[in-house]
A protein has these predicted regions:
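Charged, often Cys/His-bearing segments associated with DNA-binding zinc-finger transcription factors
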Residues: 1-57, 451-475, 538-549
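Anion-binding and metal-coordination hotspots
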Residues: 2, 97-100, 105, 119, ...
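Basic, short loop/linker segments at the boundary and entry of helix-turn-helix/winged-helix-like folds
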Residues: 43-86, 463, 467
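N-terminal core-binding DNA-recognition domain of tyrosine recombinases/integrases
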Residues: 72, 95-97
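Non-catalytic DNA-binding core/recognition domains of DNA-processing enzymes
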Residues: 83, 105-106
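Alpha-helical support elements that line or immediately flank enzyme active sites
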Residues: 85-95
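Short, basic interhelical loop/turn and adjoining N-cap
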Residues: 108-126
Length: 549
């Protein structure tokens, strides 16, 4: 049963099995249509983007990775996977739709040349080829929690970085908000929409099951009548009626419609937006608790979440980008995609956890949102130096950088003056150390004005932590010239989000986390190819930085 999800393609209610076969059309044959071009046409073709794509990108696509998506039985062979993946990248490069990509492959010789299909009697893409391939990838990821397309894009990025002689020893990181293509709904609109979708579904399945007083929800014009074409003073009464109708629907659907998506969204909406008090349903308030950013924003995209950042409201997703930098430019070598309430710090932790330990020291430059003692320690375990160009939170006194802690951070070994403490107790809950020194050590210490200990008759006490110590060290390093050069280098990654928004049309992203991530991966691959093409043609101008030397 599991194999049905990704081993079958359904067309006109007939199940079509497809077996995996590698693409044998890698070299130009004697009958290749390329031979029919004039010398002038061949020269123009070899100067175009298609030549770079055909020589560097297409051969680097690993078809075998995707063999698990197809049947191992003898059956009709699949469309060549490297042609499909190449087409998905070119589609984003020129902002084609699926249908436009299929049509242009038949008519544009540059596309055929780029995808090595000039020897094909018939171009291999049909109107459903790309969508079926995406569906196979989605189903495989759902079953096995492995994103084959993400791995493919990352491997292509690594190949491009190698061609551009970018070692990956210096990387920079930034995140970007991606808006879901949904309307901002008020709470009343959200409840109405969920009721309406369920009512339409019930009416379609069995018209007699929906009571007459609820049939108005199936009218496309009813939304405007209920929400907008009434006085604002009636809002409370309309809301009461909506909640009463919701309870009626809930009772009607308990036995028959629990397996439908519309019912699940309806129940989720009621559980998140309302509470039942003394037998009466009402809107949930802050005092009731349970109000959070994961609440459904619109049933058209139930995975989209809410986040407020830099004074702006966002509904949708967020992407995290890691860009490797070198003298010859930069390449996005990894990307992550999640709901927009996923923090930058979480992205970094997940990225480091899946990263293998680096053979050579690697630097990752980030902004303050990625900072933290745990992140720094995790990076160190992978032979990665985490450099944050700014810090969030409370300023740490500079003198704390000169305290010496044990490796676990549970004990202060020496103060800046070199004295060992008389006693030190670790407070597990706050992760701080309460440290006592002899009275005379602190009373006559030249650092007293900076440490500011509480001096008593026999002892002097100070409370500090290894986190504050590490923070003070970072603050001190930030004033160095090398650190300033790293900060200047990190600024470049902030051009990537604007580049993707401007040139790769994020507003056309499909709804849903899984589908959005797939399309975003194609955009990253297209962006990296453009960087490679500019490098090959000598079109890139890259500001040099001393840390790249």
């Amino acid at each position: 049963m599991l194999l049905l999800l990704y081993n079958r393609a359904i067309l006109e209610k007939k199940v079509i099995f497809m077996s995996f076969k590698e693409n044998s059309y890698q070299q130009i044959s004697f009958t290749d249509s390329f031979s029919g071009l004039t010398a002038r046409e061949q020269k123009a073709l070899e100067k175009s983007w298609a030549k770079v794509f055909a020589d560097e990108i297409f051969p680097a696509i690993d078809e075998k990775r995707f063999c698990v998506l197809y049947s191992n039985k003898a059956s009709r062979p699949n469309t060549p996977v490297n042609v499909i993946v190449g087409a998905l990248i070119i589609k984003e490069l020129f902002d084609y739709s699926d249908d436009e990509m299929v049509e242009n492959l038949m008519l544009d010789f540059r596309l055929q040349y780029a995808l090595h299909t000039t020897s094909f009697e018939e171009q291999p893409l049909s109107d459903k080829t790309l969508s079926r391939f995406r569906r196979r990838c989605y189903d495989y990821e759902t079953l096995h929690n492995k994103d084959l397309y993400h791995d493919c894009v990352n491997d292509l990025s690594a190949s491009i970085a190698k061609l551009m002689r970018i070692s990956g020893k210096i990387r920079r990181m930034d995140s970007m908000m991606i808006e879901s293509n949904i309307r901002k709904l008020s709470r009343m609109e959200l409840i109405y929409t969920c009721i309406s979708k369920l009512a339409v579904s019930m009416n379609k399945a069995n018209a007699s099951a929906l009571p007459e007083d609820l049939k108005h929800y199936t009218d496309p014009n009813d939304f405007n009548r209920v929400i907008y074409h009434q006085r604002s003073t009636d809002a409370e009464e309309r809301l009461k009626q909506l909640l009463a109708d919701a309870d009626k629907l809930l009772t009607l659907c308990e036995s028959e419609y629990q397996d439908s998506t519309e019912y699940d969204l309806f129940v989720r909406c009621l559980s998140e937006q309302t509470v039942v008090e003394n037998g009466t349903r009402r809107l949930r308030t802050k005092e009731d608790g349970g109000m959070n950013s994961s609440m459904m924003q619109n049933p058209s995209d139930p995975e989209a979440t809410f986040r407020s950042k830099a004074g702006k409201e966002h509904r949708g997703y967020t992407a995290n980008l890691e860009e490797s930098v070198g003298k010859n430019g930069s390449v996005v070598t990894d990307y992550q995609y999640d709901q927009n309430n996923h923090s930058d710090s979480q992205f970094l932790q997940e990225h480091l956890e899946q990263m293998e330990k680096q053979e050579e020291r690697t630097v990752i430059i980030t902004d303050g949102a990625y900072s933290g003692t745990e992140n720094t320690q995790l990076a160190s375990e992978k032979n990665v130096e985490l450099i944050t160009t700014s810090l969030t939170g409370k300023f740490a006194p500079d003198i704390l950088a000169d305290f010496e802690f044990n490796e676990e951070g549970t004990k202060v070994l020496r103060c800046p003056a070199g004295y060992a403490p008389k006693s030190c107790s670790y407070m597990k809950q706050s992760r701080q150390c309460a440290v006592s020194f002899l009275h005379e050590q602190c009373a006559n210490c030249p650092y007293q004005d900076q440490c500011k200990p509480k001096i008593f008759k026999r002892v002097a006490k100070i409370v500090t932590s290894k986190a504050a110590h590490e923070r003070a060290k970072i603050q001190r390093d930030m004033s160095s010239e090398e650190y300033k050069n790293y900060a200047r280098l990190r600024n470049g990654v902030e051009t990537v989000p604007s580049n993707i928004r401007r040139n790769y049309h994020l507003e056309k992203m499909p709804r849903g986390k899984q589908r959005g991530k797939f399309f975003f991966g194609s955009k990253i691959a297209a962006l990296n190819f453009r960087k490679l093409f500019n490098y090959v043609k000598g079109l890139g101008n890259y500001a040099q930085n001393p840390v790249l030397a």
